[in-house]
């Protein structure tokens, strides 16, 4: 549905040359929710704006639904953009128009008959859960409701693709979850292809099928969400994954934690489980095999792309030789082990 090939984007600021994107290629199959994640300034907003040519690539090809956009005339591009809806971090609603009027605007600009506008807008407001807000003005809506209006407006022309540019960044966590569930529902109901950009791995984890990691204008990793969470290939991907599961060392342990071993100490371990290692009874197996005891301090588990993953803080009691053997055995069974110190 979306195929970006060798996209490069260069900006000129006086004598400065800024390369925002460098030879980026990305394929989003029809009907998928595809996430692009990166830190601020990584190039993700520039990338998504290249899809509908709000930013025209310096080099490269942009195919949407089999149509090459970079070679179209202005009138042809305007027509092609009707198949590409877009929502933003800021809702960009017209304060002088009601909810109905905001959603109706693209249909009015397309000279759609009034009875068809009424039918379509009513249908869309029901879809986004605002069936009772036809006559409300944006000033009377919450942030989540405003974004729902923006989503309805983006769907007014019945597009095949929806672009989401940090669409939940300005929302509180509960509202973010509700908007993401709405996008997932729209994807299922309409078969809509969704490309979203974000700096939050929680967003990717919650609704995406595939994810690409962008850094300094380059895609450094891309795969299914389950594969990236199970086997991240780059330090940046690992960092984003760790941000979704974070366990703080309890304060009483922090006060006692030492960097080097001392007499009668035990190591404190941070264990990361993904895929099959989550469900296997690995800790009890280490106890049987290596005569060690594990005191679990805290643990957290979650799902992403249908794959379970989690982290755990534990003390491992046993002789130095036994604990080292147990740690090596865990690592052999795809558990990432970090020795945080000794208590």
From Swiss-Prot:
Pfam families with a match to the protein in the record: ABC_tran, NIL
Membrane topology per record: Peripheral membrane protein
Residue intervals of the ABC transporter domain: 2-241
Gene3D superfamilies: 3.30.70.260, P-loop containing nucleotide triphosphate hydrolases
Keyword hit for 4Fe-4S: no
Family: Belongs to the ABC transporter superfamily. Methionine importer (TC 3.A.1.24) family.
Protein's job: Part of the ABC transporter complex MetNIQ involved in methionine import. Responsible for energy coupling to the transport system.
Subunit structure: The complex is composed of two ATP-binding proteins (MetN), two transmembrane proteins (MetI) and a solute-binding protein (MetQ).
Protein name from the UniProt record: Methionine import ATP-binding protein MetN
